[in-house]
Regions:
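C-terminal regulatory/interaction regions
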Residues: 2-21, 26, 241-327
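Active-site HxH/HxHxD metal-binding segment of metal-dependent hydrolases
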Residues: 6-7, 51-55, 67, 73-148, ...
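Glycine/proline-rich low-complexity segments that form flexible loops, beta-turns, and polyproline
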Residues: 14-18, 129-132, 157
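Conserved beta-strand hairpin/beta-sheet module of binuclear metal-dependent hydrolase folds
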Residues: 30-90, 163-177
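Residue-level signal for inorganic ion chemistry
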Residues: 43, 83, 211, 236, ...
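Metallo-beta-lactamase
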Residues: 67, 74-76, 148-239
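Histidine-centered divalent metal-coordination motifs
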Residues: 100-106, 157, 211, 281
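Residue-level signal for the nucleotide or nucleotide-sugar donor/cofactor binding architecture
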Residues: 108, 187, 273
Length: 327
């Protein structure tokens, strides 16, 4: 299998990839063990990505000799070897390769796939495709024996993020929007919450995530994610309202974090996780017209733009989804 050994890593230059790898390892250290290769259902085969943490899940979909692959891990040589040996042992050929989004831990294996299977060069699909790739449109259908896959555009984690609905199983391949365990990083919180509602409305029972175990109750998981994001919005608004009541006109992000989480968290958690997340919440609230900012000493200071009770209530869609979960 040595001739199948490859390796490629697409790196976002704004990201400290070493720190992110360490973060993934720490976050996933106590998660359930996932087999390198597992036939989850007669239609769904999962191959583990061999990248940091528990890895990125690659899915091979269908029941015949030609099947569809979703995501390609991060380009680790071990992944390429595992894919080649698995497909060979099962007499499987790939007809399409679908990428949920551009992040390197999902697209990094593409060069190895093309090297091993040159016929796939014109069969790599992604929303906002790179050169040589094919576009994916919202609602586009892909078919192989035993599987009908419908693509939906659900941005937020990234602008190009797609999920894929496996119609025969009433299941969704959720990419990074909904994880098997934990919660996802978000590029645009407003778009992300709109996308979660769109995902919820597809009425899929099962979720195959790009990271972690299978999600057995996808509507509940989505509802909890929406509720958690809304609660953070409410906490931010309440923190800004409290500061105004104490004659403090505006707060820096670090002060908003302190009001919500206290002062006891370690500095890496504060600066690498909490402050970026609260910054995203504030930017969404600004887009909603609920907060504003002023510049002081060259830095943004945030304040509540309105003091209406309805701003502290969950949106109707979230209330309905949470109520459905309770019932």
């Amino acid at each position: 299998m040595e001739n199948n050994r490859g390796g490629y890593r697409q790196i976002n230059k704004s990201l400290n990839i070493c720190a992110f790898d360490d973060y993934l390892k720490g976050q996933t250290a106590n998660l359930p063990v996932i087999a390198n290769v597992e036939q989850l259902t007669p239609r769904v085969l999962r191959i583990l990505g061999q990248n940091p943490g528990k890895g990125t899940n690659t899915y091979v979909i269908g029941t015949g000799d030609r099947r569809i692959m979703v995501d390609t891990s991060g380009g680790e040589p071990e992944w390429a070897e595992l894919v080649a040996s698995t497909l060979d042992s099962m007499n499987i050929r790939l007809s399409h390769v679908l990428l949920t989004h551009w992040h390197g831990d999902h697209t990094g294996g593409v060069p190895d796939l093309i090297r091993m299977y040159p016929e796939l060069k014109s069969s790599i699909y992604k929303n906002k495709p790179d050169r040589g790739q094919q576009d994916i449109a919202d609602g586009q259908i892909f078919r192989v024996e035993g599987a009908t896959i419908r693509a939906i555009h659900v941005p937020g984690h990234s602008e190009d993020h797609m999920c894929f609905i496996l119609e025969e199983e009433q299941a969704m391949l959720t990419g990074d929007n909904i994880l098997g365990t934990g919660t996802s990083a978000v590029e645009d919180l407003g778009s992300f919450m709109t996308s979660l509602k769109k995902m919820y409305d597809q009425n899929c029972a099962l979720g195959y995530s790009a990271h972690g175990i299978t999600i057995q109750n996808l509507p509940m998981k989505i509802g909890r994610e929406l509720g958690q994001k809304w609660r953070r919005e409410r906490q931010v608004l309440e923190a800004l309202e409290r500061s105004r009541m104490h004659s403090v006109r505006s707060l820096a992000i670090k002060d908003v974090v302190s009001q919500i989480y206290g002062e006891s968290m370690d500095q890496p958690t504060r600066t690498l996780t909490l402050e970026p997340f609260i910054d995203e919440v504030l930017r969404k609230l600004a887009g909603d017209g609920k907060v504003g900012f002023e510049m002081r000493a060259g830095k943004k200071q945030w304040y509540a733009a309105q003091a209406k009770k309805q701003d502290l209530k969950a949106p109707l869609a979230v209330q309905v989804q949470v109520q459905e979960i309770i019932l």
